[in-house]
A protein has these predicted regions:
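N-terminal subdomain of nucleotide-sugar transferases
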Residues: 1-72
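Short alpha-helical donor nucleotide-sugar binding micro-motif in glycosyltransferases
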Residues: 282-283, 290-295
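Conserved acidic donor-binding segment of nucleotide-sugar-dependent glycosyltransferases
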Residues: 341-342, 346-353, 362-368
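A conserved nucleotide-sugar
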Residues: 116, 225-228, 234-279, 286-287, ...
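Short hydrophobic beta-strand element within catalytic cores of glycosyltransferases
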Residues: 317, 322, 326-329, 339
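Donor nucleotide-sugar binding/catalytic pocket of nucleotide-sugar-dependent glycosyltransferases
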Residues: 49-52, 69-70, 148, 165-210, ...
């Protein structure tokens, strides 16, 4: 759904989106929320270009009516900085600071050149740090207005590094519009900037499937979906599994990859869990929907990690709720924006395997309660996280910026 009045005002406007992530194919999940937002806004008549980093020398191309300009910033083998979490890679391997520096410098030059040639009407900057550094020359010298979208990570960096906070305090007031993916992220912005911030959550990027019932003799499935890094708290879910297995046979399905994958597999071996855990890696959207449809409980055990980073929103919970699945999660970051405790899911303390196990066992022992949470979650997602609502919010932000 689009607003006809706002559609008229966006007709023919060229919006250039600067993002570290964008799917390489329509079926890709890496940056799927950026792609889905753009596709949903195309009926407004606006033209979109995406400026995103190359992944191992990937070329620029046009996909679904959107030109994706892939900028080169390093040798092919090192062009994977933004895959699986740049902050974690920088923390674990300081030498990654070299491609990170080149990313900003070469990205700035190429973005300015692209803006000089294309003259967009608006720059939509995802993650204002570091992308605000890259967008600023084009915005200031060419007079292009900006909308800035914060996702949480850049603001948690600001808490840790004074120079990031100083930059954002100076940079945020330059924008014609600022958005946050959750009230948690909005709160972090408000510590640096006292102007208006529009909360616009992510919407569903996969098509929900009907529930797939268990086959005779099949044990209940617990599902986790996400990047395998510290802030996702998967190690605590693995520690909870022996407690669950002592009372109930289950199978854990883990979708996603990340820098901690080998450590987590080693933890599985130490706990003797190899036979009941499946590491599925990256999957297609069709396969992901299949996993949601066939699971009994979805668990997101996120934590505030050692860097102070945590969950900005948690789109995977929205996907699980869209499949009417009961969710067990932790009350960190933007998760409470999605889960209403004891109505659409269960929230337990972070870093607490016993609490995770207790919540999962409660749902498996009470299928009627689990089904009720799933139904409530589906209804809530259809209301608060519908694309109709989300796109109207984006239209208002963009129209105000280009007016």
């Amino acid at each position: 759904m689009v607003n006809d009045l706002e559609t008229t005002k966006l007709q023919g406007k060229h919006i250039l989106v600067l993002s570290s992530v964008y799917p390489l194919t329509p079926d890709g999940n890496h940056g799927a929320f950026v792609r889905e937002t753009i596709l949903r806004l195309q009926p407004t008549g606006a033209k979109f270009t995406v400026f995103a980093p190359a992944y191992e020398a990937s070329k620029s191309y046009t996909l679904e009516g959107v030109h994706i300009y892939r900028f080169r910033y390093c040798l092919k083998r090192f062009e994977n900085l933004v895959r699986d979490g740049a902050p974690t890679k920088l923390q674990r391997q300081p030498l990654n600071l070299i491609p990170a520096t080149l990313y900003v410098i070469l990205g700035t030059v190429q973005l300015f050149w692209l803006c000089l040639r294309k003259r967009p009407d608006l720059l939509h900057v995802q993650w204002p740090f570091p992308h605000g550094v890259m967008a600023m020359p084009a915005a200031k010298l060419l007079g292009i207005p900006m909308v800035l979208s914060c996702h949480g990570g850049e603001l948690l960096l600001a808490k840790k590094f004074g120079f990031v906070a100083s930059f954002l305090r100076w940079f945020l007031p330059m924008a014609k519009g600022i958005t946050a993916n959750s009230s948690f992220t909005q709160g972090l912005i408000n510590k640096l900037y006292d102007g208006p911030v529009e909360v616009i959550p992510y919407g569903l990027t996969i098509e929900a499937k009907p529930a797939i019932p268990r086959q005779e003799g099949e044990v209940p499935k617990i599902l986790f979906v996400g990047r395998l890094d510290e802030r996702k708290g998967v190690r605590y879910l693995l520690e909870a599994l022996p407690i669950i297995l002592a009372k109930q046979p289950v199978r854990l399905r883990i979708v996603g990859k990340g820098i901690l994958e080998e450590e987590l597999k080693a933890q599985c071996q130490e706990l003797g869990l190899e036979s009941v855990i499946d590491f599925l890696g990256f999957v297609t959207k069709e396969e992901l929907a299949q996993e949601y449809a066939s699971c009994d409980v979805f668990v997101l055990p996120s934590i505030v990690d050692s860097k102070g980073d945590t969950e900005g929103l948690g789109i995977v919970m929205i996907e699980a709720l869209a499949h009417a699945k009961p969710v067990v999660a932790t009350p960190v970051g933007g998760i409470p924006d999605v889960i209403i405790p004891d109505q659409t899911g269960l929230l337990v303390p972070e870093k607490n395997p016993n609490a995770l196990a207790k919540a999962v066992l409660e749902l498996l022992a009470n299928p009627e309660r689990a089904a009720e949470l799933g139904r409530n979650g589906l209804s809530d997602v259809q209301s608060r996280f519908s694309w109709e609502r989300i796109i109207l919010l984006w239209q208002k932000v963009f129209v105000k910026a280009v007016d």
